Regions:
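Acceptor/aglycone-binding surface of glycosyltransferases and processive sugar-polymer synthases
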Residues: 65-83, 88, 100-177, 204-223
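Cell-envelope/extracellular polymer assembly enzymes that use nucleotide-activated donors
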Residues: 9-11, 36, 182
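Acidic helix N-cap motif at the loop->helix transition within catalytic regions
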Residues: 21-25, 46-54
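Short hydrophobic beta-strand elements that form part
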Residues: 11-15, 38, 63
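A conserved acidic beta->alpha catalytic loop
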Residues: 41-50, 96
């Protein structure tokens, strides 16, 4: 496989909010592997919008005003990707933590697992990995396994490949970054296969890091969301998964 794909079915979506220091390099790195790039500017106020304008001949820009959260930005990106005729999208964060040279790892799964969501699993022991992120990820992994029966290594990774058709009809409760967890849970209940591929991750030193994660507030939001998802699992998710299992037995 060539290092760069011109697969007309696939694009890369980059949601961004105030990433002026990293967005240009992320875009240029991604374009080495995929020529179709959609950047969703989620109400940036720091010069990111001007930086994207200078790249407008290389990318498709979707602008959301005001800032609505990562989940809102992803939904806008998925909508644009479907409008442009794509069937699959890779999502990658704009802060530079993901390596574009891992894109071929996702592409290598596309033909044999076209109906699956593929999650890039990070090494959570990497240098400079925030301790709060490690705890939050393990916490999220536990609840995801309880809600779906699926053991996934990194439920909070934003580096993913989505089959866009599998996202149709999946309503979201939240619009912030925890919406990525919702997408996985609802997709699992709908029968979409979900598995991981290992990816690299880079976390800059704390004094250079741009983070929109608010430990106490966001932990409370995630806890409330998981409570709601557990209730939904009892009254809907488990029943739907059980019905599929019965159909497979008698198929």
């Amino acid at each position: 496989m060539d290092s760069k794909t011109d697969n007309k079915r696939l694009c890369v979506i980059i949601p961004t909010y105030n990433n002026v220091r990293t967005i240009r390099q992320v875009v240029m790195d991604v374009r080495q592997y995929c020529s179709q790039v959609i950047v969703v500017d989620d109400g940036s106020t720091d010069g990111t919008s001007a930086e994207l304008s200078s790249l407008s001949e290389l990318i498709t820009i979707v602008t959301c005003q005001p800032n609505g959260g990562k989940g809102h930005a992803l939904v806008a990106g998925f909508r644009k990707a479907r409008e442009m005729g794509f069937t699959h999208a890779i999502t990658i964060d704009a802060d530079g933590q993901h390596f574009a040279d891992d894109i071929p790892a996702f592409l290598g799964q596309l033909d044999s697992h076209a109906d699956a969501i593929i999650v890039g699993a990070r090494n959570l022991t990497e240098e400079n990995m925030p301790r709060g992120n490690t705890f939050a990820n393990r916490f999220s992994n536990f609840w995801f396994r309880l809600q779906t029966g699926i053991d996934l290594q990194d439920t909070q990774s934003g580096y993913r490949l989505y089959p866009l058709g599998a996202l149709r009809g999946l309503g979201l409760i939240t619009s912030r970054y925890e919406a990525e967890l919702e997408l996985l849970v609802f997709a699992a209940w709908a029968g979409t296969p979900i598995f991981s591929v290992p990816v690299k991750v880079y976390y800059p030193p704390a004094d250079e890091r741009v983070s929109h994660f608010r430990p106490v507030y966001d932990f409370v939001r995630i806890s409330i969301l998981n409570t709601v998802l557990c209730v939904l699992a009892l009254v809907y998710g488990y029943l739907r998964m059980a019905a599929r299992a019965v159909r497979r037995i008698f198929a």
